[in-house]
Each structure stands twice: as C-alpha cells, then as structure tokens.
Amino acid sequence: MSKNVPNIRILMAVGLFGVMLGTVGLPIYLHAPKYFSDTYGVSLASLGAIMFALRVVDFVQDPLLGRLSTIGFLPRRLLSAGAGAIIIIGALGLFIVTAPINPTIWFALSLILLFTGYSLSVILLYTHAVNNFADKAQTIVARWREAGQL
C-alpha cells in the first residue's frame, strides 16, 4: 500500500475513535474511585495505590501489546474488535456488575481489562498509521486522535 496522507474521511474516523477512547478516561479516573469508595467502603488511598500499581503494569505490558500488534497471527480488525470488547467488559465489571469477590480485587481486575483494552486500541491505531501513511501524516493522525479525546 502506498504511504500517503489520509483523507478527511479517515481523519474523522480517527477523531471518532479518539472520542470513544476519551469517554473511557473520565469515568475511570473520576467516577470509579468515588463509586467504589461510596458503594463498597474502599478507601480512596487504597484505590489510588491500585491505580498507580496498574499504571506500572501498563508500562510493562505496552511493549508486549505492541509486539502482539505486529506479529500478524491475528488480523488487526479482530485485535481491534477484541480490544473494544475488553474495554466494554472492564467497564461493565467496574460500574454495572456487583463485585462478586473482594471489591478491591474486583476494582483491580476491572481496571486491568480497561487499561489493556485502551492500550491495545491506541497501539493498533498508531501501528496502522505507521504502516499506511507517510511520515508527515503521523502528526496529523495524532492531532485528530487527540482532538477527538478532548
């Protein structure tokens, strides 16, 4: 495939993808800790420590997800759909399903799913951009994704 600059239709799709990813962030960082604190009595300090620890896990897993996205044993569309499904399952676990186990552990498990799905989605987006668009288009794609997240 030739490396070119994406057309406006593709950029709008990237922006819409950014909107979807942006809607995940606010509930995770603002609403989830308060919800778990109010509903289950888990201290905000504990929830903050869990969130920090999971960001460290995310730091380690992101290169592995990047490798997964380039191996090619699964079609990227399937990986992308899987990432979206993981985000949905994590969000349902966080806000809809009553914690069937210790709420602190349930919070951590739900966030692991959300962070993994989010990271894989972003990695797949940028992998697609690198593989399909010219170098000068990378910042354009990033700009549209970030604008969508705002």
What is each stretch, according to the model?
Residues 1-150:
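Membrane-embedded alpha-helical bundles of multi-pass transporters/translocases
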